[in-house]
Amino acid sequence: MPDYEKVIEASGNGRYSKLNTVLGKGAYKVVYKAIDREEAINDNEITNVKVTRQEFKDLGHEIDILKSVRHPNIITFHDAWYNETEFVFITELMTSGTLREYIRKLTPLPNIKIVKRWCRQILKGLAYLHGHEPPIIHRDIKCDNIFINGAHGEIKIGDMGTAEMKNGKKYTVIGTPEFMAPEMYEEQGYNEKVDIYAFGMCLLEMATGEYPYGECTNAVQVFKKVTQTIKPECLSRVQDPELLTLVNICLTPEDERMTAQEILEHRFLAVEPEVVLVSKDMTMKLLTLQVVFKGMDKLSVKFEFNADTDTAADVVAEMIEEQVLQNCYQQLITCEINRILRDIARNQGPPDKGEDEKIVWRRENDIRSELERAKKDLALAVERVFEAEKKCELLEQHNIIAEERCKETIFALEQAKFQIPDLLQPQPQPQPQPQPQPQPQPQFQLQPQLQYLSPQSTTSPGPTSDDNSTNSTMLSSLESELSKLCVSGDEQVETTTHSALMENVLAGKAKYYEYSNDTSIDKFVMDTAGATNRSKDKQKQWAAKLQDQDIMTVGDLRDLHDEDWSGIGLTVFALRALKNMLAGKKAAVTQRGLQGTRSGASTPVEEQEQELM
């Protein structure tokens, strides 16, 4: 013991002594270094927690359980007692601190091999806890509560103070919000699978070095995202596809979530087996081989192999059929057996010619079967790549066509915007003549794809009493054609110009009243779909996606923040249509101003342009 370390307190039985070295402090506890005088070791820590005597009595059953927990990947709980106003307990000391502190020190982040090793140890500890009857739920799994011995890469689960045995479902809300499963916030209760959800968040932190939901500024935002099953932003920065798949498996709903033991058997955490030669007879024909799974709890598989009558492919297929081996190991173990046979043949010397031919034939047969299998896999991969390229080319063509049509539509609308206000200006009516000549009407020319204003309309004499209705009809035709183009553009092109154009058109076609907060979302979506010329199928799709987000009334829709709109899952066109429909009062004022202009009100040209936009 160094000179600066001194004993400041001893346990009631005299076995443990508390030193003056403080290892950590929390809101309710202080952790000191301690010595075990019976074992003569100082790799223990003593923790003082402020509790009442009654609370300590209530913890008696849990303390007895924690004392009985013994596993290489769980910090050992030695003893506990009540000391006046404090609950004191002795646990094993981990030299390198928490896993979170260790990850922060690493530059760059740990590689996949190290992450796999950590995951296996954490899952083994969880599988042990969940394997009790009834299961023990930790309820606060996070990298801050997982400890490491950096010299050996040893991982252990600690801070078992929140652990509890499960008889049926639990309802107590306890833990860290970023690592708490959605069911912990609900009234239906939860089980040991909340630890699997928290493990998924730990795996995410190991892979990215980022704290889950780091984009949130408070616990309320975290709660909202968790209950809406919105995953952390750092999930998009996971590079390894298999690791990403494993994280998503851990974050699935409770009834779909795998157990700790099942995740241990996932291919991402699987250790490649190795085939070793255990023994051989004098003739080198009868061999005893063994499949060894290093770093896993699986038992080794030992089997006999006759070099004269057996082939590697047949023996491995037989073991898979008898469920001794998993199918995913077939190719690897077959190659390993063939490697051992080649080594024996090379060291044995030149065999008889007949036997040599048999061995060569068997080896060639095995190689041919492996090549055929590889060819099939390659052909399938090439076919998938070809199909993906075709889809990409088709999407590019659709995007080009949609962009061209959108540009033409914008040009046509600009033409209409600058020509129609001149036609809408009130003109003096011509004096009646004895034999009036028919006034030439404005001419409009219909192009193959869009309707444009004919140049003649700008030079025609002053409009008659039917001119306003003709111009209105022309504008309606342009809006109708634009809506048709936007149906395809809604699914393929979402440029800034296109979105702004949709908003301007929708603002002129919206219903002219405000909706009350208790208006049903079905009624609101039906009006929006009707105003934008959308089909009933589109209406149902919009309503379904809103209701999936628990948006049942117009009031729920108004309560959404800007960042919440993007999480609904609708297209940009649909979101803008819904937002315009919410602004019904503004649209009504705009429409009344436009009607006043057409009936002869003296509105300036600039105001008319603003109304049309």
UniProtKB/Swiss-Prot annotation:
Q: In UniProt terms, what function does this protein have? A: Serine/threonine protein kinase that probably participates as an intermediate in an intracellular system controlling nuclear proliferation.
User: What enzyme class is recorded for this protein?
Assistant: transferase
Biased-composition ranges for Pro residues?
Answer: 427-441
**Its gene?**
pkpA
Stored SMART domains: S_TKc
Q: Where is this region: Disordered?
A: 424-475, 589-613
Q: Where is the composition biased (Polar residues)?
A: 592-602
Q: Which UniProt keywords apply?
A: ATP-binding, Kinase, Nucleotide-binding, Serine/threonine-protein kinase, Transferase
Coiled-coil boundaries: none
Active site as annotated: 140
Q: What family is reported?
A: Belongs to the protein kinase superfamily. Ser/Thr protein kinase family.
- What Gene Ontology molecular function terms does this protein carry? ATP binding; protein serine kinase activity; protein serine/threonine kinase activity
Domain Protein kinase: residue ranges = 17-269
**Chain residues that bind ATP:** 23-31, 50
The answer to whether the entry has keyword Membrane is no
Family matches, as PANTHER family? SERINE/THREONINE-PROTEIN KINASE WNK WITH NO LYSINE -RELATED
The superkingdom listed in its UniProt entry is Eukaryota
* UniProt-listed Enzyme Commission number(s): 2.7.11.1
Q: What is the catalytic activity of this protein?
A: L-seryl-[protein] + ATP = O-phospho-L-seryl-[protein] + ADP + H(+); L-threonyl-[protein] + ATP = O-phospho-L-threonyl-[protein] + ADP + H(+)
Is ATP-binding among the key words of this record?
A: yes
Stored InterPro entries? Kinase-like_dom_sf, Prot_kinase_dom, Ser/Thr_kinase_AS, WNK_Ser-Thr_kinase
Q: Spell out the Low complexity composition-biased ranges.
A: 442-475
One Pfam match, by short name? Pkinase
Q: What is this protein called?
A: Serine/threonine-protein kinase pkpA
